[in-house]
Amino acid sequence: MRKRDLEGEFALAWRTLAPARAPGFEAQYAFHPRRKWAFDFAWPAVRVAVEIDGGQWAPHGGRHSRDSDREKLNQAAVLGWRVLRYSGQMLQDPEAVIGEVVEALERA
């Protein structure tokens, strides 16, 4: 499945399954002061982000793509972000994914 489709699945799951008290997300949130990196979904006030693996993480993704993603995630950690990553397979259990994100937000 394409990354855009997976992101749509996450957004729909969040809207339908997240508790009313949970804050809304910002999509494609640019988090780095100098690089053009963006998280798929972010809650900037508490520095929690979600990345949906797809596109470059598909089986054909090469070493350069993986290294670039590692650099992005390392820089996010340096800046104090907690990044949760989900695959298409994991999104097949939306209750578990959304529950985990809500838990991360509550602990932030």
Predicted segments with their positions:
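Nucleic-acid endo/exonuclease domains
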Residues: 1-108
